[in-house]
């Protein structure tokens, strides 16, 4: 018997909104989980007996917890021999650089305060290429020597073969000479810009010193993101350099699959201009659209620093943008796989865009526990336990993201208690799988009230049974979404208030 769909069309229940200042007194931090170890199944085997008089088995009366098995969502766990990468002269290639997680910059700190930031003029002017699941990583398992991560899950979950896809990337550093960009500029009669370069062109721009750095956007153990432009070009772009060390064949597949993303054309998807692999350093560089408003993660932390709270109407526009982006990606047969606050960007005009569909999640598991943990916090229960990963898993991650931004804290555990500092990741993942889902609650002490439809939207996103969880396009028909679509919100003014821009 098939499961009934989630009842999204429940009549909306109006909620009250309080007026006046709402100074939050919450602390942020993705806490570890309670200081307790997961309970293993403790079935007792048959009792020992003499051969002539065997005794019956005595099963344990203790119930076994849900099975938390190792996950291989998109890949294979079989070992595949790795070939030693070699240079053009036949000698073995030097090992790539070691890893180092990407922390976003959260500058522009000010001491002013806000009430609800809803776009109004109130307030001051202003990756996993691993074959293991989150649980196996938390238990200390590592990839066996000689095994190769499955390239099919290297960047985004492209779940159909694309005609000519293998031809999308030429091995530009071995099979041919790089283009002379000065000559190409003369032929075009104008300076080159981001749309003029393919992957060979981007590698040539790097080697011919045509990429001008304008400032750092963040750096850490996994790499760095820099604001750049091409020499004599007009477009400012973000260059993300990833220094982690997956298998070389996977790196090539990553560059190929980024070209799938390059063909995406949606106002809700951060545009990818190109990517290239530098074999001398073992890094992958990704040129992408620069979104000046920053990530939702940096925005809500800045709002918290200012003593405010992101308003429900702003959250509605953010949710609408994410759902539209996920719907578009699904039409391209792509699953994002890594929805979280740091992968939701806002432009200066307030446009919401998705970035990193798979990039940070895939690289995050390789030698950087903090990055991996940060990603796995937003995983749907089915992904934690190794079940198939679908587009509705991204809807779960959206629910966790909205709940975190609304409450200014990570929503697990649901009661908001502080967790023990030495509790392990496996405890938290087990908690997410086994315990009731968190709910959005009003905060009378801070005079903060959320609408009943918003609370119901979060509840629908955090449906634990995948068949009952709605798709992104179905969630766009939710009563809360229909209500939010009719709201007038100046998202550009909201971003301007957060960062204190005067123009």
From Swiss-Prot:
E.C. numbers: 2.7.11.24
Keywords linked to the UniProt accession: ATP-binding, Kinase, Nucleotide-binding, Transferase, Virulence
Domain Protein kinase: 211-481
Biased composition (Low complexity): 121-130
GO molecular function: ATP binding; MAP kinase kinase activity; protein serine kinase activity
InterPro entries from the UniProt entry: Kinase-like_dom_sf, MAP_kinase_kinase, Prot_kinase_dom, Protein_kinase_ATP_BS, Ser/Thr_kinase_AS
Disruption phenotype: Results in severe sensitivity against cell wall-disturbing compounds congo red or calcofluor white, and drastic alterations of the fungal morphology. Impairs phosphorylation of mpkA.
Primary enzyme class: transferase
CC annotations in GO: cytoplasm; division septum
Pfam families found in the cross-reference section: Pkinase
Residues that, per the record, bind ATP: 217-225, 240
Catalytic reaction(s) noted: L-seryl-[protein] + ATP = O-phospho-L-seryl-[protein] + ADP + H(+); L-threonyl-[protein] + ATP = O-phospho-L-threonyl-[protein] + ADP + H(+)
SUPFAM superfamilies, sorted: Protein kinase-like (PK-like)
Comp. bias intervals (Polar residues): 100-115
Compositionally biased tracts (Pro residues): 53-66
UniProt-annotated stretches for the region Disordered: 1-130
GO biological process: cell integrity MAPK cascade; filamentous growth; MAPK cascade; positive regulation of calcium-mediated signaling
Reported function: Mitogen-activated protein kinase kinase; part of the cell wall integrity (CWI) signaling pathway composed of pkcA, the bck1-mkk2-mpka MAPK cascade and the downstream rlmA transcription regulator. The CWI signaling pathway regulates cell wall integrity and pyomelanin formation. CWI also controls oxidative stress response, gliotoxin production, iron adaptation and asexual development. Finally, CWI is constitutively required for A.fumigatus to cope with the temperature increase found in the mammalian lung environment, during infection.
Protein family: Belongs to the protein kinase superfamily. STE Ser/Thr protein kinase family. MAP kinase kinase subfamily.
Protein name: Mitogen-activated protein kinase kinae mkk2
Origin species: Aspergillus fumigatus (strain ATCC MYA-4609 / CBS 101355 / FGSC A1100 / Af293) (Neosartorya fumigata)
Source organism phylogeny: Eukaryota, Fungi, Dikarya, Ascomycota, Pezizomycotina
């Amino acid at each position: 018997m098939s499961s009934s769909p989630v009842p999204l069309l429940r009549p909306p229940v109006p909620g009250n909104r309080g007026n006046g200042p709402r100074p939050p007194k919450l602390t942020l931090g993705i806490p570890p989980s309670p200081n307790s170890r997961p309970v293993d199944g403790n079935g007792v085997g048959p009792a020992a007996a003499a051969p002539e008089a065997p005794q019956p088995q005595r099963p344990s009366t203790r119930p076994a917890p849900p099975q938390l098995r190792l996950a291989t969502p998109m890949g294979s766990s079989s070992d595949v021999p790795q070939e030693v990468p070699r240079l053009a002269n036949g000698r073995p290639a030097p090992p790539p650089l070691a890893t180092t997680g990407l922390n976003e910059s959260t500058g522009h700190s000010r001491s002013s305060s806000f009430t609800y930031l809803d776009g109004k003029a109130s307030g001051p002017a202003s990756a996993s290429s691993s074959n293991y699941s989150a649980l196996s990583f938390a238990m200390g398992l590592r990839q066996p020597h000689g095994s190769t991560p499955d390239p099919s899950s290297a960047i985004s979950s492209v779940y159909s073969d694309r005609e000519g896809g293998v031809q999308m990337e030429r091995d530009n550093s071995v099979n041919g000479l790089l283009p002379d960009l000065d000559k190409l500029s003369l032929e075009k009669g104008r300076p080159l810009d981001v749309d003029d370069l393919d992957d060979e062109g981007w590698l040539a721009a790097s080697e011919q010193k045509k990429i001008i750095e304008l400032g750092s956007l963040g750096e850490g153990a996994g790499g760095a993101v820099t604001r750049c432009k091409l020499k004599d070009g007009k477009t400012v772009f973000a260059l993300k350099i990833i220094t982690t060390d997956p298998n070389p064949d996977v790196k090539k597949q990553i560059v190929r699959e980024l070209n799938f993303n390059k063909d995406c054309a949606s106002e809700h998807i951060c545009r990818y201009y190109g990517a290239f692999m530098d074999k001398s350093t073992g890094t992958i560089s990704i040129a992408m659209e620069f979104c000046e408003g920053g990530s939702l993660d940096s925005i809500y932390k800045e709002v918290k620093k200012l003593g405010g709270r992101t308003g429900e109407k702003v959250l509605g526009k953010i949710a609408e943008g994410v759902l539209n982006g996920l719907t578009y990606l699904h039409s391209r047969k792509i699953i994002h796989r890594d929805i979280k606050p740091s992968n939701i960007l806002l432009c200066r005009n307030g446009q919401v865009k998705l970035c990193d569909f798979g990039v940070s999640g895939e690289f995050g598991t390789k030698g950087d526990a903090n990055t991996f943990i940060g990603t796995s916090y937003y995983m749907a229960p089915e992904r934690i336990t190794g079940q198939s990963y679908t587009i509705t898993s991204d809807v779960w991650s959206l629910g966790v993201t909205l709940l975190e931004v609304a409450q200014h804290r990570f929503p697990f555990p649901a009661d908001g208690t502080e967790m023990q500092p030495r509790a392990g990741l496996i405890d938290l993942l087990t908690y997410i799988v086994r315990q009731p889902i968190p709910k959005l609650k009003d905060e009378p002490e801070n005079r903060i009230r959320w609408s009943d439809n918003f609370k119901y939207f979060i509840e629908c996103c955090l449906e634990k049974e995948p068949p009952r969880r709605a798709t992104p396009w179905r969630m766009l028909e939710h009563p809360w979404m229909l209500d939010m679509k009719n709201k007038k919100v100046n998202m550009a003014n909201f971003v301007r208030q957060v960062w204190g821009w005067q123009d």
